[in-house]
């Protein structure tokens, strides 16, 4: 494990710029075709698959995803965001940042990163605001669950919109019962070349989204379920830690104004669901440790890709990889929020996730459930690699 990310892990060679990027993409076409043919023949024989328990389709799909990620890393592709609704239509909302006092400690504004306007997608639709409800309070008849979900993507990709998160959002809503709604913030990506938003922008956006649910929409925190997969789980658990610390430190005496005190006393959510969570960036940023991992060959996320994600969210000049908010596996804390932690038995993060669950369970008062799905790689729910 390492304390600081390697800046050289961020792709920056000739392939990341034009015309090199276009040339490399053209070269990649026959490369992918040849690899696909090779693996499609090789994996006919189950002993030759990365995991002998996998079906032919699982083995081939996992390897092709891994190949695609290698090419994405080689060209240094990152995603830029827009606040326009586009095809998302009336499921889309934009949110103004909260009062400056809501962002404190490590998530306070600095000269490089400040809270900003974000967008987000509701599934299946936007709930009524207090003004739209006749009694002006959180009075849904069924008191159904509201999920605040943070997508994966190594802080480099994805948006939470239907094209990349719709299937998972619908699956989550269905699993949590009738009437469930989920809100997927389009948090700022650290690889977005338009905004250049670095750490702690995604965490600031999580605070903005939570305040939007509780204060603007009047949704009781007892109805809110936090959820996150992979890097999204990093954000979800960071929000749990931050809100718990906020409530401990907040008091009327240190509030600047009455509205400030209300923000500082945001109640904690009901539960936090984490799927294949990235809870140890000091491990993910260490390429040599990942290459030695027992699941290195069965996961589609390779060592250079993980190191890139770690370096992107944690530039060494700004934050350490072993920061409590980036490597919470090393810093268990007491929380009344129930924690559910899932990992795949064939993913690189499997042992890290199991260790984190054990440490958090050992804290008196914590309620932690750990589920390990045998023979599955990273973030299996999002990538649909299961049979």
Across the structure, where does each feature detected by a protein language model lie?
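Short, surface-exposed "cap/lid" segments of acyl-processing enzymes
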Residues: 119-176
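Gly/Ala-rich beta-loop-alpha elbow adjacent to hydrolase catalytic centers
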Residues: 228, 232, 236
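Extended, polar/charged low-complexity intrinsically disordered and coiled-coil segments in eukaryotic
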Residues: 1-142, 281, 308-311, 340, ...
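Fold-level signal for large, globular catalytic cores of enzyme and receptor domains
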Residues: 149, 177, 193, 212-219, ...
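Conserved alpha/beta-hydrolase
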Residues: 172-192
């Amino acid at each position: 494990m390492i304390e600081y990310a390697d800046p050289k892990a961020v792709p920056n060679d000739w392939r990341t710029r034009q015309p090199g990027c276009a040339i490399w993409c053209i070269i990649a076409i026959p490369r992918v075709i040849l690899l696909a043919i090779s693996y499609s023949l090789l994996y006919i024989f189950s002993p030759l698959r990365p995991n002998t328990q996998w079906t032919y389709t699982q083995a081939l799909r996992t390897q092709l995803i891994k190949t695609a990620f290698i090419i994405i890393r080689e060209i240094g592709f990152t995603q830029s965001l827009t606040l326009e609704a586009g095809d998302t239509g009336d499921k889309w909302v934009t949110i103004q940042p909260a009062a400056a006092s809501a962002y404190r400690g490590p998530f306070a504004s600095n000269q490089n990163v400040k809270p900003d306007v974000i967008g987000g997608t509701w599934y299946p639709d936007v709930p009524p605001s207090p003004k739209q409800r006749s009694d002006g309070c959180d009075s849904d008849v069924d008191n159904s669950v509201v999920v605040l979900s943070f997508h994966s993507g190594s802080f480099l990709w994805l948006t939470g919109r239907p094209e990349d998160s719709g299937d998972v959002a619908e699956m989550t809503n269905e699993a949590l019962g009738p009437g469930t709604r989920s809100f997927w913030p389009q948090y700022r990506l650290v690889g977005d070349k338009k905004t250049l938003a670095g750490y702690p922008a995604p965490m600031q956006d999580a605070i903005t989204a939570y305040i939007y649910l509780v204060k603007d929409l009047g949704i009781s925190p007892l109805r809110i379920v936090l959820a996150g997969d992979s890097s999204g789980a990093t954000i979800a658990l960071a929000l749990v830690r931050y809100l718990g610390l906020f409530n401990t430190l907040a008091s009327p005496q240190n509030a600047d104004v009455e509205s400030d005190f209300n923000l500082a006393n945001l109640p904690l959510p009901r539960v936090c669901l984490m799927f294949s969570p990235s809870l140890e960036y000091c491990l993910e940023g260490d390429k040599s440790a990942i290459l030695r991992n027992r699941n290195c060959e069965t996961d589609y996320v390779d060592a250079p890709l993980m190191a890139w994600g770690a370096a992107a969210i944690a530039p060494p000049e700004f934050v350490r990889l072993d920061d409590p908010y980036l490597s919470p596996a090393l810093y268990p804390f007491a929380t009344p929020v129930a924690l559910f932690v899932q990992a795949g038995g064939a993913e690189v993060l499997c042992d890290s996730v199991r260790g984190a669950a054990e440490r958090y369970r050992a804290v008196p008062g914590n309620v932690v459930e750990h589920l390990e799905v045998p023979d599955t790689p990273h973030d299996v729910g999002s990538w649909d690699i299961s049979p």
